[in-house]
Regions:
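Subset of outer-membrane beta-barrel
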Residues: 3-296
Length: 296
């Protein structure tokens, strides 16, 4: 994850649904709201939602680097919601080498950890959110930083051939904040802010069948070692609000392009989503994602 980025955890996926739908965090988000789109939670008739996810890449000789996410959403008043979450990335074990090239009796276990807070507000067709994160990264020594983001969504409807289409537009500016600073060495590494834009179209064929099309683009706003431009497209078929089938594609200049396949289901407030991302370049890897949650 995170080629060229001083915080690889930022490149991890937090939602199995989002990951396979072109990696687009759009207005139609259904889970992991703090990391996908907090304003989308206010469109649901829910007071609380708790979600957890895990991203599983292939195992390497040094171990398997797993990415965990846990988040909760609370609508404490009409059109207002608070969010809390945490992300954790670890699993690799690296042997230390001495100056003579031989192993020494010390092992490095790198990890990344964040704690995150967010707030969202909705009025008529508009939604607004802000969030902040504390990031800690440890390799040989520990580094930390604080990052912030904000976004806006617009939701409305139109009619196409007598069918209702729900559409949404979403924009986010994220990763704005201080450089990553390592305490012991006082070395600093700039974090590049990003801009994300997306559009969602959900066609209700009838009461049982819906199709959702997502289009998105993103990129860094400042020059740096992790410069990238990305675009994605996703298609989701929903049956009777119980079963979802998903297909998506995303391309990023810094990483390989990927094909996403996914399935999800929900019943009695419980949802479970599986996603598989197939890397389409010789140097890329395939990853499995699982997201589960409960709404009440």
């Amino acid at each position: 994850m995170g080629q060229g980025s001083p915080l690889p955890l930022l490149e991890g996926n937090t939602s199995a649904r989002t990951a396979v739908l072109g990696n687009i965090r759009g207005a139609s988000a259904k889970d992991m709201f703090l990391y996908t789109n907090p304003t989308a939670f206010l469109t649901k008739e829910a007071t609380f939602q708790v979600d957890a996810s895990i991203e599983i890449p292939p195992k390497l000789p040094e171990g398997r680097e797993l990415f965990y996410t846990l988040t909760g959403a609370w609508s404490f008043a009409t059109s207002h919601a608070l969010f809390v979450g945490a992300r954790y990335n670890a699993g690799v074990k690296v042997d230390m080498m001495g100056s003579d090239g031989n192993k020494v009796d010390k092992v490095i276990r790198p990890y990344d950890l964040t704690t995150d807070l967010g707030y969202a507000y909705a009025v008529e067709h508009w939604g607004f959110f802000a969030r902040g994160s504390y990031h800690r990264r440890k390799v040989l020594v520990e580094g930390e930083t604080y990052l912030f983001g904000a976004g806006i969504s617009y939701l409305n409807q139109y009619t196409l051939f007598g069918k209702v289409v729900d559409f949404g537009l979403h924009a986010t500016v994220d990763r704005v904040g201080a450089p990553l600073r390592y305490r012991a060495s006082n070395d600093t590494y700039a974090i590049q802010p990003i801009l994300e834009l997306s559009a969602d179209q959900c066609l209700s064929i009838n009461e049982q069948h819906q199709l959702t099309l997502l289009l998105g683009a993103s990129g860094t706003l400042k020059e740096g070692p992790a410069n990238y431009r990305a675009a994605g497209v996703g298609l989701e078929y929903s049956y009777n609000k119980l079963l979802d089938l998903r297909l998506g594609y995303d391309y990023q200049t810094l990483r390989s392009h990927t094909l996403g396949l996914g399935i999800g289901g929900q019943l009695y407030g419980i949802h479970l989503d599986l996603g598989y991302r197939l890397g389409l370049a010789s140097y890329s890897v395939n990853t499995l994602m699982v997201t589960a949650g409960y709404t009440f």
